[in-house]
Amino acid sequence: MIKVEIKDETFYVPTSWDEVTIGTLLKLNELKEKKYTSNIDQTAEVLEVMTGIATETSLELSLDDFKTLSSLLEWCSEMPTEDKTVKEVFIDGVKYIPVDVSVMSAGEFISLEVFQNEKSADKNIHLLASILIRPEVEGEIEKLKDMKNIQQRADLFSDKMTVGQYWPVFNNFFVGAVSSSLKNTQVSSSQQKSKLKIVNS
C-alpha cells in the first residue's frame, strides 16, 4: 500500500490486486454500469472505491495532483495475468482449497453455471469463489451444502479474500477446464469415482 495524505487525512492506495478484496472488485464492477459525463468523474469514483478518498476530496485537488494520484492506480485497468497456481488460502485460521474439477458433481456444475450465466455475473464473483474455493474438513474439501452456506462463505470472501488470491483459481477453472458445459460433465464423469452401474443394456 502507498500512504498518501490529503488535508491532514491519511489514505492508503493499493499497489496490486493482492491488496484488493473481492468486495472492492464488486464495487468496481458496479461502476461499469454507470454513465459518466467525463473521465475525471469516473476516475474520482474509482479512487473512492479503491482508497476511500471521497470524490469531493479528489475533485478539489489541482489537476496535476489528481493525475498523480490516479496514476497510482493505472495497474487496475487490467485483471491479473500472471500464470500462477493457488493451492490454498488461509482466512481467519481456516484453510480453504480450490476444488478439483475432476471430483465436482453435476449438481455443483449447475450451481456454477447459474451464477456464471446470469446477466449479472459480474455481481456474482464472490458466489463463484464460494463454490470454487471451500474449507478443508478432515483432509477433504467440503461438499456444497445449501444456498445459505454458499452465501455465508461468499460474504466472508467478499470481505477477506483478495482478488490476487482468487483470480488464478477463476482463470484456471473457467479458461481451462470449463470451456463448455458438455465438456465439463464429460470430464467430471470420467475422472470422478463412479457411482453409476449399468445393470442391463
Predicted regions and their residues:
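Charged interaction scaffolds used for protein-protein
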Residues: 1-201
